[in-house]
């Protein structure tokens, strides 16, 4: 089931959770979507600023599998 996250801080807390499995990064021309898969929900954060998206990509936890479909 999907859930939307509005704040970057909340997304990072969710990504650091023990049940977080992977992160998918989907890029469009307008925005970047970060989707983190946890045991119950798929949490989505939408960012329209490309620079913020790059910073967030670098601040993801190192143990998490990051998938970037082309």
Swiss-Prot record:
Source organism (scientific name): Macaca fascicularis
Subunit structure, as described in the record: Component of the large ribosomal subunit.
One biological process term in Gene Ontology: translation
Keyword Cytoplasm applies: yes
GO cellular component: cytosolic large ribosomal subunit
Keywords noted in UniProt: Acetylation, Cytoplasm, Isopeptide bond, Ribonucleoprotein, Ribosomal protein, Ubl conjugation
Cysteine disulfide links: none
Molecular functions per Gene Ontology: structural constituent of ribosome
Stated family: Belongs to the eukaryotic ribosomal protein eL38 family.
Protein name: Large ribosomal subunit protein eL38
Major location category of this protein: cytoplasm
Glycyl lysine isopeptide (Lys-Gly) (interchain with G-Cter in SUMO2) crosslink location in chain: 4, 9
Primary role: Component of the large ribosomal subunit. The ribosome is a large ribonucleoprotein complex responsible for the synthesis of proteins in the cell.
Localization: Cytoplasm
């Amino acid at each position: 089931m999907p859930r939307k996250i509005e704040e970057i801080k909340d997304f990072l807390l969710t990504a650091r959770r023990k049940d977080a499995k992977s992160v998918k990064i989907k890029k469009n021309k307008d925005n970047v979507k970060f989707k983190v898969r946890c045991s119950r929900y798929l949490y989505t954060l939408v960012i329209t600023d490309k620079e913020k998206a790059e910073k967030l990509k670098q601040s993801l936890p190192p143990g998490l599998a990051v998938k970037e479909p082309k």
